[in-house]
Design a protein with these regions (language model features):
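Phosphate/pyrophosphate-binding catalytic cores of soluble transferases and nucleic-acid-acting enzymes
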Residues: 1-310
Length: 310
């Protein structure tokens, strides 16, 4: 929805898109060019100790450009979309007050949407007893219940992520209303420019596969073992993303070899990326930049014009 006030709202460039498309690198380049700071919009990078598996920016990159909303909570804790929304708005406004330019960068659709569209997220506190009951149910039963209570959320939710499914059910059961009906859109807080990097599908898959190989070489397995030693359960790892899920299953003996685990992980990320692309393609506000050598200069020119108010 468009509002006449858009012209006077603070301007917020937003870099979105699928995994391994180059969002973080482009965000850093733009922040350097326009005296900016970066707010992460990644639902897994909020967790401490999950660095390799989430492709978190390095300490050297953080030293170059301030990054916000990384390492917010421990992996065993819950961090809701509502908590993210409140924290991100606070950080963005602080950056603006200091005369710097905020850039929102990430690939988690719900995090991005709650800032770009300023959704009113239902403020339902975690219900430990209800969650414990739901966690005892098989995934198929949870999905069937969500389909009955909230068909719209059922159609769009990550069906391999029990944590998100349980949260949606939690809101439905506590409020008596579908989760999707409670995400009202308020007036926007920022005038946003949404950019994404577009790669041919086969090249994007090659980038994904190369990233998986790099993560394994950098110590991804050791990172998962460290999380287990810190008390993060295998069940929790299942909900923390594909990399942690597949390595956990291999360590438990559910996958016979490391080579098989890596190959299955790559295929799973390909599938996840297809769903990411479907979600982002639906948003016609996103401007897609062809990946390649000319992309960075094109992005800089677009952001320059956008920030100038033209």
């Amino acid at each position: 929805m468009e509002y006449s006030q858009t012209a006077i709202l603070p301007r917020l460039p937003v870099i979105v898109g699928p995994t391994a498309s180059g969002k973080s690198s482009l965000g850093i380049q733009l922040a350097q060019r326009f005296a900016g700071e970066i707010i992460s919009a990644d639902s897994r990078q909020v967790y401490r100790g999950m660095d390799i598996g989430t492709a978190k920016v390095t300490p050297e990159e953080r030293a170059m450009i301030p990054h916000h909303l990384l390492d917010v909570v421990d992996p065993g804790e819950t961090y809701t979309v509502s908590q993210y929304q409140q924290a991100a708005i606070t950080v963005i406004n602080d950056i603006l007050m200091r005369g710097k330019q905020p850039f929102l960068v990430g690939g988690s659709p719900h995090y991005i949407q709650t800032i770009v569209d300023n959704f009113d997220i239902p403020a339902v506190a975690p219900q430990p007893e209800l969650r414990a009951q739901l966690e005892e149910q098989p995934l198929e039963a949870l999905l069937a219940q969500l389909e009955q209570l909230d068909p719209q959320s059922y159609a769009t939710i990550d069906r391999r992520n029990p944590r998100r499914i349980i949260r949606a059910l939690e809101v439905c059961l506590v409020t008596g209303k579908p989760f999707s009906d409670q995400r009202g859109q308020a007036r926007p807080l920022y005038h946003c420019l949404l950019l994404a990097i577009d790669w041919p599908r086969e090249i994007l898959y090659q980038r994904i596969d190369a990233r998986v190989d790099e993560r394994m070489a950098e110590g991804m397995v050791q990172e998962v073992e460290s999380l287990l030693q810190q008390g993060v359960s295998h069940e929790r790892l299942e909900a923390l993303g594909l990399e942690y899920r597949f390595i956990s299953r291999w360590l438990r003996g559910e996958i016979s070899s490391k080579e098989e685990m890596v190959q299955r992980l790559k295929y799973a990320i390909h599938d996840f990326t297809r769903r990411q692309l479907t979600w982002f393609r639906r948003d016609k506000r996103i401007l897609w930049l062809a990946g390649g050598t000319a992309m960075e200069q094109q992005a800089q020119e677009m952001v320059k014009v956008f920030l100038s108010g033209k």
